[in-house]
From Swiss-Prot:
Keyword Glycoprotein: no
Pfam families noted in UniProt: ThiC-associated (PF13667), ThiC_Rad_SAM (PF01964)
Function: Catalyzes the synthesis of the hydroxymethylpyrimidine phosphate (HMP-P) moiety of thiamine from aminoimidazole ribotide (AIR) in a radical S-adenosyl-L-methionine (SAM)-dependent reaction.
Family: Belongs to the ThiC family.
Originating gene: thiC
Taxonomic lineage: Bacteria, Pseudomonadati, Pseudomonadota, Gammaproteobacteria, Enterobacterales
Entries under InterPro entries matching the protein: ThiC (IPR037509), ThiC-associated_dom (IPR025747), ThiC/Bza_core_dom (IPR038521), ThiC/BzaA/B (IPR002817)
Protein name: Phosphomethylpyrimidine synthase
Catalytic activity: 5-amino-1-(5-phospho-beta-D-ribosyl)imidazole + S-adenosyl-L-methionine = 4-amino-2-methyl-5-(phosphooxymethyl)pyrimidine + CO + 5'-deoxyadenosine + formate + L-methionine + 3 H(+)
Gene Ontology terms: cellular component: cytosol
Cofactor requirements of the protein: [4Fe-4S] cluster
Chain sites annotated for binding substrate: N239, M268, Y297, H333, S353, R354, G355, D394, G395, L396, R397, E433, Y460
Length: 631
């Protein structure tokens, strides 16, 4: 934890410096590689960790080495992870998907924005200094057309996005030759179907069935295609966003880049303060990952924070505004029905979802049904025109383990299942949001009920937190639940930072939350038996046993922390080649002793074998050549 607290001005200045000096950066001893596909422009980025050779014998003067294969890993950092790419935040990222979108011929550019709010913002000269300079001309579907990846999948079309994803999900594991690295324990998949090789056709089939989504708004061409579904790698979302009391555009862009560097598969912009529209534009134009939002937050800002004053018209305008900026998925709390609100009265912590509480208050104040539920088909029509995926929000999720798995939570889940089928009528992609606070023994029921009632649509959960006693450490309490529900079939995990329940996370909190959740997601992939998931673990274990310290650092999810902890006690360069660490020292290192035992056993076997042969030779009379019948 930092000893000195920066002022707001210092925080903004530091973030501005980060943006101004930003350049593509690789992790230590890693390089960016690209694997090409058959579609034009399909060039899938991965990070390849270079490893040092293993000493296998020889003398001090002439040592003999065996090369170790480089390890390819999934990389979410986009252009920010490629030192060869010039980064300019003022101009935004290259529009990777634009040629694919244009080639389909089913979209048209808008000459006028559909949102009245957007028109007003663009006409306000006072915002010129804040506004992103290269504003994208938005597109929407041509009349009578649907432009969603679900629509294409149902038509039997394999899009470039689907091929990109198939290559990405395989993680280059076909390159690995070593049997030691390829070894993997059988998993327990709880009904998930995990093919040995993921093909573009498999991706298409999963999307067509609604079991997976590809969040890819046609107005966010900068994003690199990714997929969310239980038959693929478990994904992690990071939340960023300003508030009414803290943060700035510079800091949010910095957090975006930081999040993608540390493994965020998607990022949600939960801004609730000033300049939400402008902040989101900067984020989208510089994001290589899908961006999600909760539109009700901004709609509430438009009515001065008074939930009772919300209207469908204001909300619809917000959907159009965000869809034309390029938001890839909306969290919509359409399952908070008027009749469910009384079910929360006996809860210890009531309704803890911001979106859920806003809609509950609106329902009660008007004594009318949730307008998001009433206008859900119109919401779907908007999403189908831009390919905005729906993340159906769990507004009645439990906010304490006492309230876990209660009547209100599962009543809403049933409704989300009904809404899923309606969205699919419009070829709109859907995932389902889940809890929350759930003790370990009650977690699996959440997954089984979601699969049953929501027709196997992907599940996306916040944790869940497995205990309520650890403010400041809720990335741990929730990481436990996240690993479990990921194993049971959850497709994406929303990270929790150390600041959960305490305050808005800063840059370091974002990193801590992401590392915790990347661990949880990877542990779930291992437990499910996802093909190739164990390769990196095997490489790490081999490096550890062979005392290849640099390789251990570089294979870690966080190489910098691993190196720093090692160097606290063994900072000298000699410590990087030592056959021990400070935990046990040179005399009691279990791996060093194991190596000695292995070497001793091998030597003994050879010596015993030679002794046996010598004795046999003497027993046969010491003759060099034996008669055929004696041989």
């Amino acid at each position: 934890m930092s000893a000195t607290k920066l002022t707001r001005r210092e925080q903004r200045a530091r973030a501005q410096h980060f943006i101004d000096t930003l350049e593509g950066t690789a992790f230590p001893n890693s390089k960016r590689i690209y694997i090409t596909g058959t579609h034009p422009g399909v060039r899938v980025p991965m990070r390849e960790i270079q490893l040092s050779p293993t000493l296998i014998g020889g003398s001090k003067e002439q040592p003999q080495y065996e090369e170790n294969e480089a390890i390819p890993v999934y990389d979410t950092s986009g252009p920010y992870g490629d030192p060869q790419i010039a980064i300019n935040v003022q101009q935004g990222l290259a529009k990777l998907r634009q040629p694919w979108i244009d080639a389909r011929g089913d979209t048209e550019e808008l000459t006028v924005r559909s949102s009245d709010y957007t028109k007003a913002r663009l006409a306000d000269d006072g915002l010129d200094e804040l506004r992103f300079s290269g504003v994208l001309t938005p597109k929407r579907a041509k009349a009578g057309r649907r432009v969603t990846q679900l629509h294409y999948a149902r038509q039997g079309i394999i899009t470039p996005e689907m091929e990109f994803i198939a290559i990405r999900e395989n993680m280059g594991r076909e390159r690995i030759r070593s049997e030691v690295l390829r070894h993997q324990h059988p998993g327990m998949s709880f009904g998930a179907h995990l093919p040995e090789n993921i093909t573009a056709e498999f991706v298409r089939d999963e999307v067509a069935a609604g079991r997976a989504i590809i969040p890819a708004n046609i107005n966010h061409p900068e994003s690199e295609p990714m997929i969310i579904g239980r038959n693929f790698l478990v994904k992690v979302n990071a939340n960023i966003g300003n508030s009414a009391v803290t943060s700035s555009i510079e800091e949010e862009v910095e957090k975006l880049v930081w999040s993608t560097r540390w493994g965020a598969d998607t990022v949600m912009d939960l801004s609730t303060g000033r300049y939400i529209h402008e902040t989101r534009e900067w984020i989208l134009r510089n994001s290589p990952v899908p961006i999600g939002t909760v539109p009700i937050y901004q709609a509430l800002e438009k009515v001065n924070g008074i939930a009772e004053d919300l209207t469908w018209e204001a909300f619809r305008d917000t959907l159009l505004e965000q869809a034309e900026q390029g938001v890839d998925y909306f969290t919509i709390h359409a399952g908070v029905l008027l009749r469910y609100v009384p079910m929360t009265a006996k809860r210890l912590t009531g309704i803890v979802s911001r979106g859920g509480s806003i809609m509950a208050k609106w329902c009660l104040s008007h004594h009318q049904e949730n307008f998001l539920y009433q206008h859900f088909r119109e919401i779907c029509e908007i999403c189908a025109a831009y390919d905005v995926s729906l993340s159906l929000g769990d507004g009645l999720r439990p906010g304490s383990i006492q309230d876990a798995n209660d009547e209100a939570q599962f009543a809403e889940l049933h409704t989300l299942g009904e809404l899923t089928k309606i969205a699919w009528e419009y070829d709109v992609q859907v995932m389902i949001e889940g809890p929350g606070h759930v003790p370990m023994q009650m977690i699996r029921r959440n997954m089984t009920k979601e699969l049953e009632h929501c027709h196997e649509a992907p599940f996306y959960t916040l944790g869940p937190l497995t205990t309520d006693i650890a403010p400041g450490y809720d990335h741990f309490t929730s990481g436990i639940g996240a690993a479990m529900i990921g194993w049971f079939g959850c497709a994406m995990l929303c990270y929790v930072t150390p600041k959960e329940h305490l305050g808005l996370p800063n840059k370091e909190d974002v990193k801590q939350g992401l590392i915790t959740y990347k661990i949880a997601a990877h542990a779930a992939d291992l437990a499910k038996g996802h093909p190739g998931a164990q390769i990196r673990d095997n490489a790490m274990s081999k490096a550890r046993f062979e005392f290849r310290w640099e390789d251990q650092f570089n294979l870690a999810l966080d190489p910098f922390t691993a190196r720093a902890y090692h160097d606290e006690t063994l900072p000298q360069e000699s410590g990087k080649v030592a056959h021990f660490c400070s935990m046990c020292g040179p005399k009691f290192c279990s791996m060093k002793i194991s190596q000695e035992v292995r070497d001793y056993a091998a030597t003994q076997t050879i010596e015993m074998g030679m002794a046996d042969m010598s004795e046999n030779f003497r027993a046969r009379g010491g003759e060099i050549y034996l008669r055929k019948e004696e041989a």
